Amino acid sequence: MPITPYTGPFGRPELQHLLRRSLFGCTTADRAHFEGMSLDQVVNELLTFTNDTTPPVRAYTDENGDPNGIDAAVPFGSTWVDTPITPLNDTDVIEVRIRSFAAWWMGLMRGQQRNLREKLTLFWHNHLPTQVSIVYQSEMQYRQNQLLRSGCKGNFKQLIHDVSVEPAMLFYLNGYLNVAAAPDENYARELFELFTLGQGSGYTEADVQAAARVLTGWTFMVENGGTPVLPQTLFFPPNHTASDKQFSAFFNNTVIQGQTGPDAGETELNALLDMILAVPECSRFICRELYRFFVHGEISAEAEAEVIGPLAQLFRENVDAPDQIAIVLRALLTSDHFFSNAIRGCMVKNPVDLVVGDLRLFDFPIPDPGLVEARYLVDLEHYWLTAYAGMNLMAPPNVAGWPAYYLYPSYDELWLDTATYPQRNNSLLAVVYGSVETPSNTVQPGSADLAFRVDIIAFVQQLSDPADPNALITDLVDLLYVNPISDAVKLQLKHFYLLFGQVSDIYWTEAYEAYIADPNTTNMTAQLVPDILRWLIGDMQKAAERHLY
């Protein structure tokens, strides 16, 4: 039975719900871009993208501001991704390149195109994670990130195949140590338990051992004859177990025929993945993962039957399709279930959605593209702001990713508690109140002594009628909260912040219009307008509702 498509109204509430789950936040510009389109048209555009990113560039210096004091092999303003670190263990260069990668990734999310690429890249990073503390190699981190964003909406078998032999994953889960003489079960176990089938799905310990033997012989190279090279995947036939591999009844008693020669690893890996994908539990597991990321952590019995089951069937029917994940996501995001009232506002935002969504919503200014040094500094500040809020992107807690996407029964509620709320709240306030400043001793003269801060007046001027305090409050509620708030709370916000304790709306209207007419006005009340707006929005940011989507 196919999943039930949504046939109800597709107005602003439905559009904002879809965009909040598909993008990092929903800005007034996002909303204006899609308004008037049908649901199918919006989802088609969200799923239409390529990996057209440009690589990170060297915009860093040593601790003294000297561009030649570190990573001198890479010219300032050029990319480092195609230059091996020499020597390999130069931790100073590794650190600055990792920070460059972090800033680059943050910049892509902050400046995301209006499609699902960045959200899906985060999804797969959580599902197929590596930790920078273990894979302490910037080129490997960059390569895997590019692999995820290139394959994020494509064919699942191809993606899991590519990740399995990617140097970052070979290193992270000991694949490079998995040899015929001493099989290492680490990756095989996680392949079954975390990446394709799920714990307790029915595979046996003997299946893990057999899969480990299938995967023997894969390794990677980061130096050649003592000279550092870019990470390269290799298959070394002498280290591969050439005997047959027997699997249990869970896998229909499949026997993967042992292979020899240079193609043995590729042949057996594909046979292993075909065997896994033939098990119905694989399709259900992946669809549950997508559901928990885009819809809700807890999956009810009804959702399992009416959503997961049909999506899994669609997944299996398109097992060879190059856009398999896009097909499944399109069905999910256009389903009746996705737009049900119970799903709207039911999830706690992860810290990336929270912080990047606010940076986008308030249009935090960023330096011109040519000012690579200033842009790097701003993006890196925002990367650490996201980490402060609770999600250091390069440091998922373990190979299972973040607990909010797998830990029953709390799931996304784990993001928000008495310990995390102050940090999350401070991060939101930092976006509205804070500024990022660049130092005087930059390499690029144009990157020196700059300050970037949200233009709160420019933000409210995007709203329907910011001079009308009632319209202003209504528009802010619509943008900041998924669910409406009471008229009494709206009235309280209006009187406390906009009317200065007065009764008539004219007090705000006159002050706002006076400031807009002349930002240098001598009207003392009008001079306070930008501060009043920050106070108002800052107070609205503190509400628990701000953390839901």
Question: Predicted segments — roles?
Answer:
Residues T28-R149, Y497, V503-D518, M524:
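N-terminal accessory alpha/beta regions
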Residues M1, A72-L88, I98-W105, Q137-L377, ...:
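Active-site substrate-binding loop specific to GH73 endo-beta-N-acetylglucosaminidase modules
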Residues M1-P2, E14, D40, D52:
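Eukaryotic PEST-like, Ser/Thr/Pro-rich intrinsically disordered regions enriched for SP/TP/PP repeats
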Residues L15, R31, L39-V42, V208, ...:
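Hydrophobic/aromatic residues in well-formed alpha-helices
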Residues P2-T27, V279, S283, C287-D320, ...:
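Flexible, low-complexity segments enriched for small/polar residues
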